[in-house]
Amino acid sequence: MQQTPLFKNHYFHQLPEFYTALQPKPLHGARLLYHSEGLAAELGLSSDWFTPEQDAVWSGERLLPGMEPLAQVYSGHQFGMWAGQLGDGRGILLGEQQLADGRSMDWHLKGAGLTPYSRMGDGRAVLRSVIREFLASEAMHHLGIPTTRALTIVTSTHPVQREQEEKGAMLMRVAESHVRFGHFEHFYYRREPEKVRQLVEYVIARHWPQWENDERRYELWFGDVVERTARLITHWQAVGFSHGVMNTDNMSILGLTIDYGPYGFLDAYQPNFICNHSDHRGRYAFDNQPAVGLWNLHRLAQALSGLMDTDTLERALARYEPALMQHYGTLMRAKLGLFTASAEDNDVLVGLLRLMQQEGSDYTHTFRLLADSEKQASRAPLRDEFIDRAAFDSWFATYRQRLMQEEQGDEERRRLMNTTNPKFILRNYLAQMAIERAENDDISVLARLHQALCQPFDEQPDKNDLAALPPEWGKHLEISCSS
């Protein structure tokens, strides 16, 4: 029997001045193209919800009982400059689903039409960008990285003009919250400190209830936001993910990866990799992400300055770098197969990264192959991947010495490495192949790629082609903010 999800909309009822209520605007010829069975199961949705009879639900044409749709208002700093009012320009929060375990999940329909915050946009999304966000959300989740999720992809016959005419599409994004740093900035710059306080009290009550009645709740909460942000970015750095548009309106208060635009996973290891071809100065380059995270937290701290004194805010911000270094160290030691911490670990890591940079080695492939090394072997299978064999041999000798300090054997170390270093990541060329087929109503590549990304650490030998290094045409794909 098909059970209707239960919606109870806290944001709608508790923060009436933080949004505009409005209805989604359906696309012509909208139909469900694909969905995440795994997420559907987590949400308690049976397969009956994903039949053609339910297309109107996923396209926003038919609201479920209890839904109260709204577009959120927020502001933000974009590329380091204050951009003023922004808000949901094409997304509508349909409602908050109440799950059996007590959690609440936003259903947010992206591409749902014009809102009061659309500015110069048309309120629409195209199939290309929707598929990219769907795949990235699923990939990041199964890599163990905090992220918003993606439930459904809707395609249509609705033409949308970008650099060329494309198919209009919609994505149902699911997350525990869509509150961003920019929500707080919006009311700070409007000189409405009571609204900032109201929002802080709301997010603490909803997501940090353990501190709701604590006199130090603001400090405890902000300190946790700082640490969540640090942990998120260390995950990005460890897996080789570049977000591309780390504006403050794209920063989740829960420390989730949100707003997948011109993102990219590293192919060749390039610390200064820029995935967004609109980022001419490299503000959001891969190796600059940790610094930008802290810069964004300073902007949030400024917005909270009416609630906490400078010393309290600075104390919380000071937790960022230690948290960043601690979590990065833990993740990178696991990538190297190290169970314990040692003074020379950083030298071992930096030595490998330097070699990879010099040779343009593939980031994911190199770490995955490293697991096949053995303590007692003077040479590793990975050696053949390097041109400068002497340099690799020198590094590998140092690495072997470090492994000798570990009690665990090769098999245990290999298990650690192969559950830390993925075999499958979402390379741009793979996403492009899925997009091109899907634009012609063939979802076979999309489905197969999605399946691989749901088990990124497993061997899946029948999908070895999806773990291949990018072909020449796939090495330099340019991705912009156009979506």
Swiss-Prot record:
The keyword Endoplasmic reticulum does not apply. It comes from the Bacteria. Its EC number is 2.7.7.-, 2.7.7.108. Keywords: ATP-binding, Magnesium, Manganese, Metal-binding, Nucleotide-binding, Nucleotidyltransferase, Transferase. ATP binds at G87, G89, R90, K110, D122, G123, R173, R180, D259. Coiled coil: none annotated. Mg(2+) binds at N250, D259. The active site is at D249 (proton acceptor). InterPro entries: SelO. It catalyses: L-seryl-[protein] + ATP = 3-O-(5'-adenylyl)-L-seryl-[protein] + diphosphate; L-threonyl-[protein] + ATP = 3-O-(5'-adenylyl)-L-threonyl-[protein] + diphosphate; L-tyrosyl-[protein] + ATP = O-(5'-adenylyl)-L-tyrosyl-[protein] + diphosphate; L-histidyl-[protein] + UTP = N(tele)-(5'-uridylyl)-L-histidyl-[protein] + diphosphate. This is Protein nucleotidyltransferase YdiU. The gene is ydiU.
